Each structure stands twice: as C-alpha cells, then as structure tokens.
A protein has these predicted regions:
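A short, glycine/small-residue-rich beta-strand->loop->alpha-helix junction that serves as a flexible
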Residues: 6-20, 203-204, 315-319
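Nucleotide-sugar-dependent
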Residues: 292, 306-326, 337-346
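Nucleotide-activated donor-binding/catalytic signature segment of Leloir-type glycosyltransferases, i.e.
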Residues: 235-295, 300-303
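Conserved donor-binding/catalytic core segment of Leloir-type glycosyltransferases
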Residues: 4, 183-204, 210-217, 224
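A charged, aromatic-enriched C-terminal amphipathic alpha-helix characteristic of glycosyltransferases
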Residues: 14, 372, 376, 385-420
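A short, active-site helix/loop in glycosyltransferases that binds the activated sugar's phosphate group
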Residues: 115-169, 176
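Active-site proximal beta-strand in glycosyltransferases
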Residues: 72-79, 89-129, 144
Length: 421
C-alpha cells in the first residue's frame, strides 16, 4: 500500500507531530508513506525548513501534484494559518486537494478543537466544500458529529445527512512509538524539579503552575517553564511578565515578582542545577526549545506538567490529548496532568476504548484546576521522589498504559478497517 500525507505547513505543533507519527506508523506497519508540504514560502518560518529537511519531508506544488495520483490513499491536513498566507496561496493548496488529486482515496484530517476556528472554517463554507469531494473525514469525533451547540455553523452532517456522514467519518486517535526507555535516568539520580513545557495558549493552563508555585517551592521543588513565546505570553498571560495591578490588569512598569526570564542568548540548561535556595521562590522561564534535544537535558527532572484541558472535554474523542504527555513518560518523567482531562478521557486497550478513566490508573498524577487537591498531589510527588523503587515502578506502569493507548499498530489497523469497511 502506498500512502501520501499532504499538509499546508510544517512546524513543531501537535498537528505536524501527528502527521509525522502517522507517516512512521504506515511505513512500519502498512506499506510505504511519503509526507509532502505545499510549497508556498508564506507557509514557513526558516526553522521550519530545517525541521522538514531533518524529517525528510518533501515539498509539492500544484504543478507536480499529479504524482500523488500514484498513491492508494492520501491524508490531507486542513492545516493552513490564513493570517500568514494570502487568499490565493491558501486556495492554491485547497484547489490542489480538490481538483489535481483525483485517483487515491482522499481522507481529510481535521484536528481542530477551538470553537472559534471551527466556526471560521464552517461559516465560510470552505470545509464543507472540500469535505463533500473527499472520501473520508478523520477528526475528533463528537466535536464534528455533535457540535450543533456552535449555532452559527452549518455542519457537514447537516448537508449530507447523519447516515452518509457516519459512512465518511472515522475518529482520530493519537499514535506514538515509545522507544526511549534505555535512556531513562535512574530514579535515584532525579532532580527534585517540575517543568512546564508548552506555549502560553490558554487551554494549556500554564497559569496553574504559577498558582501552585508557592506550595511546590516550599516543598522543595524547583519550578521551571519552557516554550513560552514572549509575544504570546504578553497577550495571554501578561502577569507572567509584569506585576499584577491588584485588579484585572498589570503594571507594565514593574516586572513580575514570580517569574524570572532567561535570555534566549544564555545557555538554556545550565541553571537546572541551581539550588532552590538561590532561586528566591521564582519560576525560571525560558522561550522556545528544540524538542529533539531538550530531553537530553530534562530527562533528569522528576516531574513535568501539562494542564491541557477543554471546557467540554467529554464532547471530544478519548484520544484528544497533547503529544508532550507521551514525550514526558517516554523520557522517564512522571507527568502531572489536568484532573478534568483524566476523569473524562478513557484509555484505549487492544485498540478499543475501555471503560477505564486515565485518572483511575498510573498514567500520571492529576491536579484539579482550582488546586483543591494540591496537598495530596505534593504528598504523592514526595512519596515517589523519596522512594526511587516506587518512582520507577510508577513510571513503568505509566509507560505501559500510554504505550497501549497510543499503540500505532492497532490504530493503523483500525483506521484502515474503517476506511475500507
């Protein structure tokens, strides 16, 4: 079987990571797979080209799109940031999918979860236009299927009917190959630290670590945050940079007393060994990082957190998650996760959704949004950190849960079964 993946852009976000993992899984378990990115200069930043070259991603234009007709299946990502491209550039990508690629089965990948973005895509009719010409839709199930609460949009299922929609729909499950256990740092050699890795996007809830900082540092934990783009942080979390004015804003003449920002020109890892007593109760904040090198340094920390959560997480597929959750445990770090995610998401066993919730297992340690269980969480963290045998047992059990949940072989088999049913 020959499979092609096409995207409008290539970067380090979860959409691109999913496509990379999909490519690896098809190459390993179901034939051959090539990954193409539409060749439009506006779609990329310079470092994205370096990422593409490293991962052997090919470029394609409308002129040479006919080569894709030699594939059996094409997975096309609805993945264009319109604010960064002209309308003609974006339409060139969509027209290529619609008109130039005619032979293979065409599967649209739509892994969007923000209502505002979904409204935008539906409101102008673009996604319906292309879905009607594609054979299948791969997406988080309930947000597409039952998202009628977004009243301004005309949904695809309303245009083609529920029965036809269900014929075309197949759920999107995150797949990931765990293979790093040989590089795990021994539990007894771990640094008593917790790291946040991610952007300042509101649904990642970086603010939770700010609110938990005082108790964590009093318990002896170094607290650091990485991946916070300065501009996005100023827009979404200004009190990470400036001091709160005591009302609903910040005083831009005063730096935040909580965070300490490290210049991108400095060594991004040399301060990891700085003792907690010299940190003045501050969270050390770093900018963007290289995901392919960061764990060579951070695999020494005991914990990492990702508080990804959505207001209606129960309305999404059980695999709606963040890839850094997998990366934490793949590198031997116990994850601290959002309890709303943990209590509303079921783990996958043998390729099927089970009745077991994430927070009923050792998949991680789960912290409430309001920090109401922070004392219990710190007690659990302390127990594991102070007992290396128990720490090692916990992370190995967690690894097995995540390996089963994201098993690429099972997911690819089920995906092909749904497409060819």
């Amino acid at each position: 079987m020959k499979v092609a993946i096409i995207a409008g852009k290539c970067d380090g976000c979860g959409v691109s990571t999913y496509l990379f993992e999909l490519q690896k899984a098809f190459n390993k378990y179901a034939g051959t797979c090539d990954y193409y990115v539409y060749d439009c200069p506006s779609f990329f930043k310079e470092n994205d080209y370096n990422l593409m070259k490293k991962l052997n991603v090919k470029t394609i234009t409308r002129a040479d799109a006919a080569k894709i007709n030699n594939y059996d299946i094409v997975f096309a990502a609805y993945h264009v940031v319109r604010s960064q491209v002209t309308e003609d550039e974006a339409n060139g990508y969509y027209d290529m999918l619609e008109y130039d690629i005619t032979h293979p089965l065409k599967v649209l990948i739509f892994n969007e979860h923000r209502p505002s973005s979904i409204i935008k895509h539906y409101a102008n009719g673009t996604i319906n236009k292309y879905c009607l010409r594609l054979n299948f839709l791969l997406s988080f199930d309930k947000i597409m299927q039952f998202g009628s609460n977004i009243t301004t949009a005309v949904f695809l299922k309303d245009l083609i009917g529920e029965a036809e929609y269900m014929k075309r729909f197949t759920p999107l499950y995150h797949l990931y190959e765990f293979n790093n256990i040989d590089n795990w740092v021994p539990a007894a050699a771990k640094i008593k630290a917790i790291e946040y890795l991610g952007r300042a996007a509101l649904f990642k809830d970086a603010h939770r670590l700010i609110r938990a900082n005082d108790k964590l540092q009093k318990a002896g934990y170094i607290v650091e945050m990485r991946g916070l783009g300065y501009k996005e942080t100023l827009e979404n979390l200004p009190d990470f940079v400036y001091e709160s004015d005591g009302k609903y804003g910040v005083d831009r003449t005063k730096k935040s007393p909580i965070t300490y920002w490290i210049s991108p020109n400095e060594d991004q890892y040399k301060l990891l060994d700085l003792p907690i007593e010299k940190r003045n109760n501050k969270i050390y904040c770093y900018g963007n990082y290289n995901k392919y090198e960061i764990y060579n340094h951070l695999n020494r920390v005991a914990y990492a957190c990702d508080f990804f959560n959505l207001p209606h997480v129960e309305d999404y597929a059980d695999s709606l998650m963040e890839y850094c959750m997998c990366e934490f445990i793949d590198n031997g770090i116990i994850p601290i996760l959002d309890n709303n995610f943990g209590s509303n998401s079921n783990i996958i066993v043998d390729g099927k959704i089970s009745n077991t919730k994430f927070n009923e297992t050792c998949a991680g340690i789960f912290l409430n949004k309001d920090l109401s269980n922070i004392d219990e969480v710190i007690e659990k963290m302390d127990y594991l950190y102070n007992n290396p045998i128990e720490y090692d047992k916990f992370r190995k059990e967690s690894l097995e849960i995540w390996k089963e949940h994201c098993n690429p072989k099972n997911i690819i088999e089920n995906l092909l079964e749904n497409i060819y049913k």
